[in-house]
């Protein structure tokens, strides 16, 4: 009997899929799985002059909602706090650094990828 991959392995697989997808759209990879006590950032990319903090969500089926619907307001707050911490940790001014929050929603084992730019409005 074959074991199902654990959640962490599955998460890494879809994060790498999202990373490759964004790279094909001319984004540059900066960092993956940045952790702090405020939360985690799945991917940090660069789109020209802007940093892009990417939340990757996967759903095998949309029976219980889409992947992007899983980014609750609580999760949004964690992402915002963690991104601000990352900027400060890297010596970047929040006021003078361009950044945004995107969501890459993956469905159907990667057959359907939905990239939502500016999915989370900071503030």
From Swiss-Prot:
It comes from Aliivibrio salmonicida (strain LFI1238). The lineage of its organism: Bacteria, Pseudomonadati, Pseudomonadota, Gammaproteobacteria, Vibrionales. InterPro entries: Restrct_endonuc-II-like, tRNA_endonuc-like_dom_sf, UPF0102_YraN-like. This is UPF0102 protein VSAL_I2655. It holds the Pfam family UPF0102. It comes from the Bacteria. Coiled coil: none annotated. One of its GO terms (molecular function) is nucleic acid binding. Belongs to the UPF0102 family.
């Amino acid at each position: 009997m074959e074991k199902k991959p654990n959640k962490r392995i599955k998460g890494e697989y879809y994060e790498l899929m999202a990373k490759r997808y964004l790279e094909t759209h001319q984004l540059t990879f900066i960092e993956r799985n940045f952790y702090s006590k405020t939360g985690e950032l799945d991917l940090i990319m660069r789109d020209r002059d802007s940093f892009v903090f990417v939340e990757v969500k996967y759903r095998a089926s949309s029976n219980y909602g889409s992947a992007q619907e899983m980014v609750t307001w609580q999760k949004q707050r964690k992402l915002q706090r963690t991104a601000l911490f990352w900027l400060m940790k890297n010596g970047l001014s929040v006021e003078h650094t361009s950044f945004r929050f995107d969501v890459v929603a993956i469905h159907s084992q990667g057959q359907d990828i939905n990239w939502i730019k500016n999915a989370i409005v900071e503030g």
